[in-house]
Each structure stands twice: as structure tokens, then as C-alpha cells.
Curated annotation (Swiss-Prot):
UniProt name for this protein: Histone H2B
Function: Core component of nucleosome. Nucleosomes wrap and compact DNA into chromatin, limiting DNA accessibility to the cellular machineries which require DNA as a template. Histones thereby play a central role in transcription regulation, DNA repair, DNA replication and chromosomal stability. DNA accessibility is regulated via a complex set of post-translational modifications of histones, also called histone code, and nucleosome remodeling.
Cross-link named Glycyl lysine isopeptide (Lys-Gly) (interchain with G-Cter in ubiquitin), sites: K109
SUPFAM superfamilies membership: Histone-fold
């Protein structure tokens, strides 16, 4: 049975109400870190986009590696230990040490609050 004009009008009205989906970015956090390190330096939209893509890529790789570790160990729960190991596997030397220490600090701060 074809849609009645009233139903069609209602559907068109509902379609008009759809809003553009908001995309989450790390721009605010990238900017905060930039200002902590170099207060006098700015960043272009293109550079911010590249940094955002980089962070999304790294987080995706860490999540993928951590999920593999969970499966290898025949576990069902992803814990901070798997994430920490994934970071150690993916990031080189000193960068991994700093990432692990900052991550541990963040988890401690979160659990204590």
C-alpha cells in the first residue's frame, strides 16, 4: 500500500530535523599541550587535522594490539595491563617509557578521585 500524503509529509519533516553528526576531535587537548610546551606558538587547521589523524591512528593501533593480547591470554577483559603492554610493543624506547608513566599517572588520578 503506498504511503498517504500525510505520512509522506511527516517523513519529510522528520528528515529535515536530522542534524549533522558531531565529530569528536582531540583538538582542544592538542592545543592545551602545545601551549604548555610552547606558549607563543600557534597551529594551523591543516596541522591540527594531521595531529588529530595521528592520535586517532595511534589509539586505534593500541586498541587493536591490546585486544590481540587479551585473546592470546584467553581472557575476556581488557585491562590497563594489556594497554600498557601494547604501548610498550608499539612505541619505541623512551617514548614508550614516558607514555607508560603518564598513563599510569592518569589511571591513578582517575581511581583516586
Amino acid at each position: 500500500m503506498p504511503a498517504t500524503p500525510a505520512k509522506r509529509a511527516k517523513r519529510v519533516q522528520q528528515e529535515k530535523r536530522h542534524h549533522k553528526k558531531r565529530t569528536e576531535t582531540f583538538s582542544v587537548y592538542i592545543y592545551r599541550v602545545l601551549k604548555q610546551v610552547h606558549p607563543e606558538t600557534g597551529v594551523s587547521k591543516k596541522s591540527m587535522s594531521i595531529m588529530n589523524s595521528f592520535i586517532n591512528d595511534i589509539f586505534e593501533k593500541i586498541a587493536l594490539e591490546a585486544s590481540k593480547l587479551v585473546r592470546y591470554n584467553k581472557k575476556h577483559t581488557l585491562s590497563s595491563r594489556e594497554v600498557q603492554t601494547a604501548v610498550r610493543l608499539l612505541l619505541p624506547g623512551e617514548l614508550a617509557k614516558h607514555a607508560v608513566s603518564e598513563g599510569t599517572k592518569a589511571v591513578t588520578k582517575y581511581t583516586s578521585s
